[in-house]
Regions:
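Charged, low-complexity intrinsically disordered segments
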Residues: 2-214
Length: 214
């Protein structure tokens, strides 16, 4: 059976991610490998029970949108002023859009907002002019947290699903992404293979979950 187009976009983006964000990889320690029965694995939007945890999950599939205003409070003077409010159809679109604004590339930011395809948003994000890896390394985790908090706090079904994972360790089972994912498939992780990735997406989701549970 052929892969779903959205899943293929997700896999292609993973391959680029590890190549482009090596400094982000080096600045976050590799965590120990937890027992698989303590984990909730997710990956592509159409695979498994928790595909909506993927940044490629989008509104035309899961029927959600979320808005973000500002973010200048977490990114110093780099954000547009006065802050504007934007509605996003996927977390990937939101992160890439904020990345473009952070670098002052409003042309690419506009292109990102014109597509509902998270794979295309990711590709536009790779073309941001004036990109500064050091600035992005410092801000990417903050941007990801703000985006994911908005996504899950503004959508009751999403929030319920996230809180429903209780205290389990959330892990993006991406075989090719050793930064935002664990660098393994769920099947490999369940066989006890040591994680190769930093799992920044899973760790960020757990921070959001803790905040929303209060």
């Amino acid at each position: 059976m052929s892969a779903h187009p959205i899943d293929e976009e997700c896999e292609d983006a993973d391959e680029e991610s590890e190549e482009m964000d090596q400094r982000l990889y080096r600045t976050h320690p590799l965590t120990h490998t937890p027992q698989a029965n303590h984990c909730t694995f997710f990956y592509a939007p159409t695979k498994g029970l928790h595909g909506h945890f993927s940044n490629f999950s989008r509104s035309d599939v899961d029927t959600y949108q979320f808005t973000i205003q500002g973010l200048e409070d977490i990114a110093g003077g780099h954000w547009e002023k006065p802050p504007k409010e934007y509605s996003y159809s996927s977390a990937e679109q939101a992160i890439m859009h904020r990345k473009a604004i952070l670098m002052g590339d409003y042309v690419t930011a506009k292109y990102i907002m014109q597509t509902s395809n998270p794979g295309k948003a990711k590709k536009f994000g790779r073309q941001v002019k004036g990109f500064d890896q050091d600035v992005w390394t410092d801000h990417a985790p903050l941007v990801a947290y703000a985006v994911l908090h908005a996504k899950f706090s503004q959508n009751p079904k999403m929030k319920k699903a996230l809180l429903g994972t209780r205290n389990s360790i959330l892990a993006e089972a991406s075989p090719r992404d050793r930064i935002w994912g664990i660098g393994l498939s769920a099947a490999e992780a369940k066989r006890g293979v040591a994680w190769r990735g930093r799992n920044l997406l899973g760790r960020t989701l757990m921070r959001v979950r803790t905040n929303l549970a209060r």
